[in-house]
Every structure is written in C-alpha cells, then in structure tokens.
Curated annotation (Swiss-Prot):
It comes from the Viruses. It holds the Pfam family NSs. GO terms for biological process: symbiont-mediated suppression of host cytoplasmic pattern recognition receptor signaling pathway via inhibition of RIG-I activity; symbiont-mediated suppression of host PKR/eIFalpha signaling; symbiont-mediated suppression of host type I interferon-mediated signaling pathway. This is Non-structural protein NS-S. It comes from Toscana virus. GO terms for molecular function: protein serine/threonine kinase inhibitor activity.
Length: 316
C-alpha cells in the first residue's frame, strides 16, 4: 500500500493558530505489489520495506530486528515476542475518559504538559485510537487505516517519508523518551507502535502528577491520577535527588577545613589520594580526555547503534 500526506492550504480566515500543518492521507488500498519486500502492520495492511531486510522469524523487540538491519514480516505480537508493560494501563484508561478541550478549559497544566509529547501540542488522539480502534477493530476498515497512517505522520513529524521510515523514527523517539522514565526496549517492544506512545504519555503523566501533588493536594482530579498511577517509582527517584541536593547544600556551607575532614571520613578515594606520597598530575592531559570521550562514545554506540539519523529539525 502506498500513502502520502497531502498538505492543505493554511486557512487564513480562522483566528486559530496551528502548530501543525493541516493535511490528509491519500492512500491506495487496492493495488499492492506483494512481490516487493513488505511487512504486515497490525495484522491488517501491508507497507513496502526498502531500507531493511524483511525476515520471517521471531525476536523479543523491534530493536533486535533493527540492530541487525532487519524488519519483521509482521509488525505485531506474532513476530515480536516481548509483552509491553501493563504498569500504566490504569492511567491510560483514565486518560481515555478525558477530553482535551475540557483539560484546556480547566487549565490542567500537569496533564497538558505531559500530553505534548510526541507532537509538541497536547493531544489525546493516540489514547483515543488505542482504545477505540485497536482494541475493538474486527475487520479491514479503510477509515481506521487512514487514521492510523495520519497518527504515524504526526508522531514522527515526517510528512514526506515512507511508512517504514515513520515507524522506525517513532520507535526511536519512544525509546529515547521512555528511557527518561525508566522504561526499556522490553517495556516498549514495538509490536504496537501507537500503544507504546500511549505508555510513554502515561509515564509522563505519572511523573508530573507525582511532582505536582505536594503543591495541589486539594485538586480532586489530581488525586484520582495520584491514586491509580505508579507514583511510588517516581517519588523514590525524587527522594534520592532531594537527598543529593540537601547534601550539596550542606557541603557548600562548610569551610575548607570542615569539608576536608568530611571527605577524609566518608570518601575512601579522597583519603587514599590525600595520604599518598606519590607525586602525580592534578588533572588529565588533553590526550587522556580525548581517549576517555571516545570510550564513552563507544559505550553509547553499543546501545544506540541501530538508531536512524534524526530528522532535519530538533526533536519535539
């Protein structure tokens, strides 16, 4: 199946400012050349695969395919075996009950801020599609497919790219954003691209709810999300950060002599260096710094070497 995003002319008469261009999806659902490399998306419709080798085997996550320059013949649970995390399912279900217009009218900043990813504007379109279409889709529906393809364009930001490139870019963004919230490739396996986006949105909501709760304890809406979301994971991290900040403030208030005594008592490396009679340099040489940076870069490449080049604009 071939599809393209057709950008519509800006509507000058409307006083509404748009962050994203108006567009619709023009796709040909009738003609498809199955002799070319293709992958079946959501067990519903095929797309052409040009940049990866299509393989008929099972692996834990989509990342395991991409790192070997491969793409599964079926992008779904049949060939991607890892199960997406269910930790944020209650939060996702609560978000499904929301209206983005009502959230804007009520000025729920913690929710609106969390829902800005991945498009840059607050949206519940991915949550709505997940619960309305993916869970209850029982037959080949051209309208649902066009809606799915439109969400791929919005999530990836790639208006003039193939569906294959859009899916890979979305998976890249999902893993990068998910990592900030403690989610791994096994939590976001890629067998349901839009479902993974919903999980990351729910994780962002959980984080902002946990950070906002202490300031707005009388907000009933906030209390509901606080009670159903796994906020304990976020709070434990915030406590650790708070301990570090308190420790740093305490050290800043110490005199040089007191801070020396403190590190002599608590830091073995500092104590060994202070008591050592061996003469050595006080800082790394430029050559040592370059080698250290190269080692860090190699470690990074081992984790993200499959990631495609980002688009020609800053990620949202």
């Amino acid at each position: 199946m071939q599809s393209r995003a057709v950008i519509l002319k800006y509507r000058s008469g409307s006083g509404h400012k748009r962050s994203l261009p108006r567009f619709y999806i023009d796709c040909d659902l009738d003609t498809f050349d199955f002799e070319k490399d293709c992958s079946l998306i959501e067990n519903e419709f095929p797309i052409y695969i040009n940049n990866y080798k299509v393989v008929y085997k099972s692996k834990p996550t989509l990342s395991h395919f991409l790192i070997e320059k491969e793409f599964p013949a079926v992008l779904g649970p049949g060939m991607i075996s890892a199960v997406r995390t269910r930790l944020y399912e209650p939060t996702m279900r609560e978000l499904y009950q929301e209206s983005i217009h009502q959230l804007k009218r009520s000025n729920k900043k913690y929710l609106l801020s969390a829902l800005r990813w991945p498009t840059g504007i607050p949206t519940l379109e991915f949550i709505d599609y997940y619960f309305e279409e993916l869970l209850f889709l029982s037959e080949f529906d051209p309208g649902s497919i066009q809606r799915y393809l439109k969400l791929l364009v919005k999530a990836s930001g790639l208006y003039n790219s193939t569906n294959e490139e859009q899916i890979v870019e979305i998976h890249r963004r999902v893993l990068i954003e998910g990592k900030k919230h403690g989610l791994t490739a096994f939590d976001l396996p890629g067998n349901d691209i839009l479902g993974d986006i919903c999980v990351v949105q729910a994780a962002r909501v959980t984080r902002l709810v946990a950070k906002t709760f202490s300031k707005m304890t009388r907000d009933t809406h906030l209390m509901i999300y606080f009670s159903i979301s796994p906020v304990e994971l976020v709070l434990s991290k915030l406590d650790k950060k708070g301990d570090k900040r308190a420790k740093a403030k305490g050290l800043m208030s110490m005199s040089a002599a007191r801070s020396y005594d403190y590190f002599m008592r608590t830091d073995l490396g500092f104590r060994e260096t202070a008591l050592s009679t061996f003469w050595a340099k006080d800082w790394p040489t430029p050559q040592e710094t370059i080698l250290s940076d190269k080692r860090c870069l190699k470690e990074d490449m081992r984790v993200t070497k499959w990631l495609p080049s980002p688009p020609h604009y800053p990620p949202l």
